[in-house]
Amino acid sequence: MTVVTVQDSLLDLADDPAPGPLRPERVPLAHGAWVDVQRGWLAGSGALFARLAERVPWRAERRRMYDRTVDVPRLLCFYGEDADLPDPVLTACRDRLSQHYQAELGEPFRTAGLCLYRDGRDSVAWHGDTTGRGSTEDTMVAIVSLGTARPLLLRPRASVGTGGNDSTMRYSLGHGDLIVMGGSCQRTWEHAVPKSTRTTGPRISVQFRPRGVR
């Protein structure tokens, strides 16, 4: 079991955890990509963070990178299509997102990937979710953030050009914030959570995806 201590003052502990109405702000990007952002969508995110930190069977992984095997700089847990999610609040989030985006996505969100960033040394490198259908089809990835805010960076892929937007976009996400990456975002843009040299508390990222997208 991974034990994570979080200062109560840094978290939203005011209410029982529950997703609110979905009223995201959409930001169009180049090449048919877009992001939706809604701050504080999940109320009571601090209580949910504490439950997930304790209940989820977090795993440390190692992956092959070029000529060596390296530690993945975060803890992981994946819940497939038929798996029960570790907390009913996550089920409520997934179902509400599926209902809201049904007209655009045409299918429900099916899986949930959880990442635990223990401190500023944990990170995820530049990438797109292009394993499976995301490499050729428009799709969506919805991310709910819990715990200490960390920046999520987005930039156009070099292979498709900037489309007039050559700057890196930065979203500081935490405390129940929601970001949804849609359209062509996974194959025409990249995203990352960089390392931080500052003293940084833990963060949990919950990623909801449709079938066949990783």
Q: Residue ranges of each PLM-predicted region?
A:
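Non-heme Fe(II) oxygenase metal-center motifs and adjacent flexible, charged/small-residue loops
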Residues: 1-214
